[in-house]
Design a protein with these regions (language model features):
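Glycine-rich phosphate-binding loops of nucleotide-dependent enzymes
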Residues: 1-228
Length: 228
């Protein structure tokens, strides 16, 4: 259910495999974003279960766990939200501080060395060609595309086993879109289970191994992508 206690998802049964990109498609308001937020522990799940297989083949139950509890349990899950400034990055902070915020969420703190986060900020800036005069500038001063590069780069740097991505290319230029698609493909090749919501159907078909179609909060079907 959402914050207003309205049921947004109903009887959703999905599996995402390691080394796979699962796309979530549907018209606006079908529950795509809410599905990712539920997996990430940001939406209340009234019934059912969300399970993650560990390295030994055992199951870890995520249902009922919020995002903080998921991190504290050492569950390797990263989430790139639709809201880049706010839920994603803190607009008034620079890149280094935003890297540190992620470390706090991982339980590393309160006395955190800035050298590691600063090095990560420099690495993301160079590798993803983030256009900013300095990593010390507030991220709010960056363009939407550059903010998205920083956010995606930060989450991928956590080396997650599961990567959830909501509308990663909304409102960004074509070059940034290609960079992000390449990053998602690289994660797939590393064996990460990627779940993403992308609005462009042609991109979904090309990028994703399988696509789950949501309609009214329910799965109406799962189809193979062109890359499958």
């Amino acid at each position: 259910k959402d914050k207003e206690n309205v049921k947004t998802l109903d009887d959703v049964d999905l599996t995402v495999n390691t080394g796979e990109i699962l796309g979530i498609a549907g018209i606006s308001g079908s529950g795509q974003k809410e599905l990712l937020e539920a997996i990430a522990g940001l939406q209340n799940v009234e019934s059912g279960s969300i399970r993650l297989l560990d390295d030994n083949g055992g199951e870890m139950e995520l249902s009922g766990m919020d995002s903080i509890s998921i991190n504290e349990a050492g569950i390797s899950l990263a989430f790139v939200p639709e809201d880049r400034i706010g839920m994603g990055l803190v607009g008034d902070m620079d890149m280094t501080d935003n890297m540190m915020i992620r470390s706090y969420r991982n339980g590393k703190g309160p006395f955190l060395d800035r050298k590691g986060p600063r090095a990560l900020a420099e690495k993301i800036k160079d590798q993803l060609e983030v256009m900013t005069p300095s990593i010390s500038a507030p991220v709010r001063q960056m363009s939407g595309g550059n903010v998205q590069k920083v956010l995606v780069g930060r989450e991928i740097a956590q080396n997650p086993k599961v990567l959830l991505v909501a509308f990663p290319t909304r409102g960004v230029d074509i070059n940034t879109s290609h960079v992000i698609y390449q990053l998602l493909n690289e994660q797939k090749k590393k064996g990460v289970a990627v779940v993403c919501v992308i609005e462009d159907l042609d991109v979904v078909l090309e990028l994703c191994d399988r696509i789950a179609v949501l309609c009214g909060g329910k799965i109406s079907g799962v189809v193979d992508g062109r890359t499958a």
